[in-house]
């Protein structure tokens, strides 16, 4: 796990201390965390056979859980246990997905509780579709990223107020601003402080 800074920009009002597990170089490339794409289960078949990657959903979920257990244990030592874990919602309204397509959120919730964090994975719920940004060509099924999109398309819990929050996403890409906007939304909702963690960081 490595530390970096998400810098303030036109979307985010302050720098945010952040962490990531490994580089994300592209599906099928050497040493890439391909399990992140498999966990999304976009095809709904519980298996991925694409760009030389052949993996079942269950195997991908186990890989993800192992990484989260390792890294969040370290973050508990760095940030303390008095932290609430929140997760970036998927791009479409949550009720548009099958349970098997929401495994990232489920695993983050499981690991958070196992390590003694407050489970806030239900504190940000997408209710309006936005564009799918992880695909090579964005799926035009909703609004593209813009300042304030999180508050416009999600319900944010009142429980955010006053909390120290670690926001988790699967992949961080600097130019997209989805994570920056969500961090700002948490601050606007009264979070005491915010940190960020991603499994993969796009290079």
Residue ranges of predicted features:
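Short hydrophobic segments within beta-strands
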Residues: 86-88, 168, 197
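Active-site-facing substrate-recognition patch
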Residues: 1-84, 91-98, 125-161, 200-202
